[in-house]
Amino acid sequence: MIAVCPNPFRDIGLKLTREAMRILNAAGYDTVVCPVFAEDEPDVIPDDVQTTDLTRVSDRCSMILVIGGDGTLLAAARKLHGIDVPILGVNLGTKGFM
């Protein structure tokens, strides 16, 4: 399973997230959406997208795909502390230090 962790404030409507999931599913991977920064503002997640918390599925993931900026990548990494899983970041931010 691959967890896709978007920042819904950067990936508006989760367009890139949906495309990434379509590609991964077509390649035979199961995917789950675990948004970063959306816990307090559920209205930013489209109604047709089912989500779960990253900490609930991280131990079953073969990879984490983070879509957002440096802050999104750092937030996901904090949630994954102690879990041995690779993280791939797709930069949608403005800094790009990571």
Region roles according to the model:
Residues 1-9:
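Generic N-terminal amphipathic, Lys/Arg-enriched alpha-helix
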Residues 9-13, 37-39, 49-98:
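Small-residue-rich beta-alpha loop regions that form the catalytic core of phosphotransfer
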Residues 15-17:
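N-terminal basic/disordered segments at the start of proteins
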Residues 19-29:
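A short, Lys/Arg-enriched amphipathic alpha-helix followed by its capping loop at the start of a domain
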Residues 29-37:
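Short internal beta-strands
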Residues 43-45:
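An N-terminal domain-cap segment
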